[in-house]
Amino acid sequence: MKVRLGVDMMGGDHDPLVVWEALGEVLLSSIGEQPVEFTVFATSDVHHQLMNSPLSRSVRIVTAEDFVSMEDSLLAAVRKKRSSMALGLDALQQGDLDGFVSSGNTAALVTLARSKIPMIPAVPRPALLVSVPTLSGFAVILDVGATVSVNPDEMVGFARMGLAYRQSLSSNSNQPFTLGLLNIGSEERKGTDSHKQTFRMLRNIFGSAFLGNIESGDVFSGKVDIVVTDGFTGNVFLKTAEGLFDFLRRILGDRLEKSIKMQFDYTIYPGSIISGLSRLVIKCHGKSHGTALFGGISGAIDLARANVCSRIADRFGDNVV
């Protein structure tokens, strides 16, 4: 199956050429595998820089009139109808792409994607879903930044999407998965009124699969497979975890064994999936360097090839009680 992947070259904290280099590495690594067709979206000045690159013969380049910056408000982003982000999402909506990757403005990407890409039926609100390494493999966390404030019904929707995602990637259709609610303590009485209500709803719906409240340290232990949280808390958790890993890597350097680096390196996982959409949109961290971009783009290819959004939609319906 040929995968058609769109990549937004613009809007991240890095130079667009860093994205270009990551694309080249992905193409080299995929030689001999099923073909991948890349379409990149960039402004005319960046397009001009890319024309002399040998890679330009293997990648389709679409020229955008503008790009969405990290400083742009949502209104400013929406008004940029011909931005690299908007053109990429338009191509995805029209069926010209199987997935789209951007490391640009998160709020703008979520808003534009939601306005252009249909939601999966019965999904109350999209969420950013990310995989993190654990002692037993990996866990998924959602939401990590799509929505700052959510209600208990929407948190339950996140739980169902996380479960549907794990089920869609499992080779064993009967494999059990466990869920936990990220909170300030493991006791049922901990947290805000919203957390307490969410706790009760998750327990009633998922039964023994819901292991209750979990603290941040429990995430990496592998205690649960799906971590449910609001976008504010999830984003703070994720950025803290990424910062801690980078800190340890700098401090320990070569003393940190390669196997350990690989086990806990978040950059080998895809970026955040905007779960709840009917088509695949991946958000890479704005500060993503070459390795993280390589992981995000490679992961997007794998997810597109697995037709993960359609499988989530099928599973989500099964998980609605």
Swiss-Prot record:
Pfam families named among the record's database cross-references: FA_synthesis (PF02504)
Gene Ontology MF terms: phosphate:acyl-[acyl carrier protein] acyltransferase activity
Keyword Cytoplasm: yes
GO cellular component, one term: cytoplasm
Pathway(s) the chain acts in: Lipid metabolism; phospholipid metabolism
Keywords: Cytoplasm, Lipid biosynthesis, Lipid metabolism, Phospholipid biosynthesis, Phospholipid metabolism, Transferase
Superkingdom of source: Bacteria
Localisation per UniProt entry: Cytoplasm
Reaction equations catalysed: a fatty acyl-[ACP] + phosphate = an acyl phosphate + holo-[ACP]
GO terms under biological process: fatty acid biosynthetic process; phospholipid biosynthetic process
Subunit structure: Homodimer. Probably interacts with PlsY.
Protein family membership: Belongs to the PlsX family.
Protein name (record): Phosphate acyltransferase
Lineage: Bacteria, Pseudomonadati, Chlamydiota, Chlamydiia, Chlamydiales
